[in-house]
Amino acid sequence: MSPQTETKASVGFKAGVKDYKLTYYTPDYETKDTDILAAFRVTPQPGVPPEEAGAAVAAESSTGTWTTVWTDGLTSLDRYKGRCYHIEPVAGEESQFIAYVAYPLDLFEEGSVTNMFTSIVGNVFGFKALRALRLEDLRIPPAYSKTFQGPPHGIQVERDKLNKYGRPLLGCTIKPKLGLSAKNYGRAVYECLRGGLDFTKDDENVNSQPFMRWRDRFLFCAEAIYKAQAETGEIKGHYLNATAGTCEEMIKRAVFARELGVPIVMHDYLTGGFTANTSLAHYCRDNGLLLHIHRAMHAVIDRQKNHGMHFRVLAKALRMSGGDHIHAGTVVGKLEGEREITLGFVDLLRDDYIEKDRSRGIYFTQDWVSLPGVLPVASGGIHVWHMPALTEIFGDDSVLQFGGGTLGHPWGNAPGAVANRVALEACVQARNEGRDLAREGNEIIRAAAKWSPELAAACEVWKEIKFEFPAMDTL
């Protein structure tokens, strides 16, 4: 060891354990425009001060470990460490705090959601000094977001590809989700598309099982798409699920979809992983494919109020990793989604610039600069009576996806699709005429049903169906 190295390693080094807050709690720190900012909901163990808990989160998700190490002297901790710069109590909750942490940009690999999450939501979530920990929000600085391609195409390019403007897009998940043969599956797709839907969808569970191998499904669905397009004169699509056990197999399926000339493929981005998702998004941009994203497994991560990660963070991560659509709850259907919170992350998906708004759970102002937007998909337990509310809540730049609400029609798939298309067109026309969809929605649907027997039959079947449970996702 050289004398110079000897001196650097020994000066200022004192072995042992010291409180995290001595190094990582810095309430006087002024955040930089290039910092990644995080808001954590922290529940410390009894006897652990909130400042120590917040500092521990900053340390364990950046440069710190449980004891002082001599190699700290070989780098500049001030340059690289995370800093807990503010702590506030959570209103109405005992022993819960919001800890704000700033991370210098040099901690993260460019263009890698995988690397960002490995640090920020890594081992720190198993830290013993905390009873629970939840990441509520992230501020992604433009200096970092510009290192990502983002969505393969974005909202405007998708509308131009489909030649569809001025209304939400309509979709349907084919049911039963498992067990159909490829030929019967393709027939169900055709019936829905010819009835007036823009898209049909593979269920997230459908990959390449013994009852229906992926290549057979792709071929029969492509046949259904082209047949429905010829009959209706509209561009149609089916979300062909390319999710697979390996990245290589996933790309092989996307290549086959491109060779068939279909417009869109699909990926389960959480079970598939961010590395696979980003690879697929790059392929889709290079080859003109739209990319639909399903969020299977999200509730394992985001449903508990005091531990895990809020979906708004997963939504931001998806916009960076890449996807043209993502499921975002419905507010009115069978799946979780409180209105103001849902609209908060819908704006984070679609808009270029979103102001901080704690009433909607948005902890930081987010500037996406030129990153394309993502269409939110409302799906899960919705039917024609929900159409006015969905049109009013989500607006034009959305996909409204009715699975059982199409296939459960008493007359079959095509009449179910007709009912949904008629209901949507009636709601859009009423809105454009200045009518109040929230107050007059049922009246608008009843009026349209008078000249659409398909809609009238759907209204009768689902007039009593409600999913009324208290939302778990509250502020």
UniProtKB/Swiss-Prot annotation:
<dbReference type="InterPro" id="IPR017443">
    <property type="entry name" value="RuBisCO_lsu_fd_N"/>
</dbReference>
<feature type="binding site">
    <location>
        <position position="379"/>
    </location>
    <ligand>
        <name>substrate</name>
    </ligand>
</feature>
<dbReference type="GO" id="GO:0016984">
    <property type="term" value="F:ribulose-bisphosphate carboxylase activity"/>
</dbReference>
<feature type="binding site">
    <location>
        <position position="177"/>
    </location>
    <ligand>
        <name>substrate</name>
    </ligand>
</feature>
<feature type="binding site">
    <location>
        <position position="327"/>
    </location>
    <ligand>
        <name>substrate</name>
    </ligand>
</feature>
<dbReference type="GO" id="GO:0004497">
    <property type="term" value="F:monooxygenase activity"/>
</dbReference>
<keyword id="KW-0488">Methylation</keyword>
<keyword id="KW-0113">Calvin cycle</keyword>
<protein>
    <recommendedName>
        <fullName>Ribulose bisphosphate carboxylase large chain</fullName>
        <ecNumber>4.1.1.39</ecNumber>
    </recommendedName>
</protein>
<dbReference type="InterPro" id="IPR000685">
    <property type="entry name" value="RuBisCO_lsu_C"/>
</dbReference>
<feature type="binding site" description="in homodimeric partner">
    <location>
        <position position="123"/>
    </location>
    <ligand>
        <name>substrate</name>
    </ligand>
</feature>
<keyword id="KW-0934">Plastid</keyword>
<keyword id="KW-0456">Lyase</keyword>
<keyword id="KW-1015">Disulfide bond</keyword>
<keyword id="KW-0602">Photosynthesis</keyword>
<keyword id="KW-0120">Carbon dioxide fixation</keyword>
<dbReference type="InterPro" id="IPR033966">
    <property type="entry name" value="RuBisCO"/>
</dbReference>
<keyword id="KW-0007">Acetylation</keyword>
<feature type="modified residue" description="N6-carboxylysine">
    <location>
        <position position="201"/>
    </location>
</feature>
<feature type="site" description="Transition state stabilizer">
    <location>
        <position position="334"/>
    </location>
</feature>
<comment type="function">
    <text>RuBisCO catalyzes two reactions: the carboxylation of D-ribulose 1,5-bisphosphate, the primary event in carbon dioxide fixation, as well as the oxidative fragmentation of the pentose substrate in the photorespiration process. Both reactions occur simultaneously and in competition at the same active site.</text>
</comment>
<feature type="propeptide">
    <location>
        <begin position="1"/>
        <end position="2"/>
    </location>
</feature>
<feature type="active site" description="Proton acceptor">
    <location>
        <position position="294"/>
    </location>
</feature>
<dbReference type="Pfam" id="PF00016">
    <property type="entry name" value="RuBisCO_large"/>
</dbReference>
<keyword id="KW-0479">Metal-binding</keyword>
<comment type="subunit">
    <text>Heterohexadecamer of 8 large chains and 8 small chains; disulfide-linked. The disulfide link is formed within the large subunit homodimers.</text>
</comment>
<dbReference type="GO" id="GO:0009853">
    <property type="term" value="P:photorespiration"/>
</dbReference>
<comment type="similarity">
    <text>Belongs to the RuBisCO large chain family. Type I subfamily.</text>
</comment>
<feature type="binding site">
    <location>
        <position position="295"/>
    </location>
    <ligand>
        <name>substrate</name>
    </ligand>
</feature>
<keyword id="KW-0601">Photorespiration</keyword>
<dbReference type="InterPro" id="IPR020878">
    <property type="entry name" value="RuBisCo_large_chain_AS"/>
</dbReference>
<dbReference type="Pfam" id="PF02788">
    <property type="entry name" value="RuBisCO_large_N"/>
</dbReference>
<feature type="binding site">
    <location>
        <position position="204"/>
    </location>
    <ligand>
        <name>Mg(2+)</name>
    </ligand>
</feature>
<dbReference type="GO" id="GO:0019253">
    <property type="term" value="P:reductive pentose-phosphate cycle"/>
</dbReference>
<dbReference type="InterPro" id="IPR036422">
    <property type="entry name" value="RuBisCO_lsu_N_sf"/>
</dbReference>
<dbReference type="GO" id="GO:0009507">
    <property type="term" value="C:chloroplast"/>
</dbReference>
<feature type="binding site" description="via carbamate group">
    <location>
        <position position="201"/>
    </location>
    <ligand>
        <name>Mg(2+)</name>
    </ligand>
</feature>
<keyword id="KW-0503">Monooxygenase</keyword>
<feature type="modified residue" description="N-acetylproline">
    <location>
        <position position="3"/>
    </location>
</feature>
<dbReference type="GO" id="GO:0000287">
    <property type="term" value="F:magnesium ion binding"/>
</dbReference>
<dbReference type="InterPro" id="IPR036376">
    <property type="entry name" value="RuBisCO_lsu_C_sf"/>
</dbReference>
<dbReference type="InterPro" id="IPR020888">
    <property type="entry name" value="RuBisCO_lsuI"/>
</dbReference>
